[in-house]
Amino acid sequence: MVSMQNDRIRIKLKAYDYRILDKAVAEIVDTARNTGAGVAGPIPLPTDIHKVTVNRSVHVDKKSREQFEMRVHKRLLDIMEPTQQTVDALGKLSLPAGVDVEIKL
């Protein structure tokens, strides 16, 4: 048993594409459940939207603008009462490229 003050692992995932994010979450949930740990989540967190407005032309026509946006999708997972087998399996897990993972014990 992983000896911590609170017996949970909190995993926060971020990605620009929600489809690969959901695949990564599904892999983590399957791995945790197969090793005997309980899983709370995935909890969808608010999406960060970064908007950038630029002029279409260089020096003229200020009314003609274009907007671009970048969305960062986030999910939160809690793995309750993880065993050593769970920690080892999560360490060996290969997630898709483009998924940022933060782990708090």
Curated annotation (Swiss-Prot):
Record keywords, A-Z: Ribonucleoprotein, Ribosomal protein
Highest taxon of source: Bacteria
Family according to the record: Belongs to the universal ribosomal protein uS10 family.
GO CC annotations on file: ribonucleoprotein complex; ribosome
Oligomeric form and interacting partners: Part of the 30S ribosomal subunit.
Name of the featured protein: Small ribosomal subunit protein uS10
Listed GO MF terms: structural constituent of ribosome; tRNA binding
PROSITE patterns linked: RIBOSOMAL_S10
UniProt xrefs under Pfam families: Ribosomal_S10
Described purpose of this protein according to its UniProt entry: Involved in the binding of tRNA to the ribosomes.
Organism (species): Solidesulfovibrio magneticus (strain ATCC 700980 / DSM 13731 / RS-1)
PANTHER family for this protein: 30S RIBOSOMAL PROTEIN S10 FAMILY MEMBER
HAMAP family associated with the record: Ribosomal_uS10 (MF_00508)
GO biological process: translation
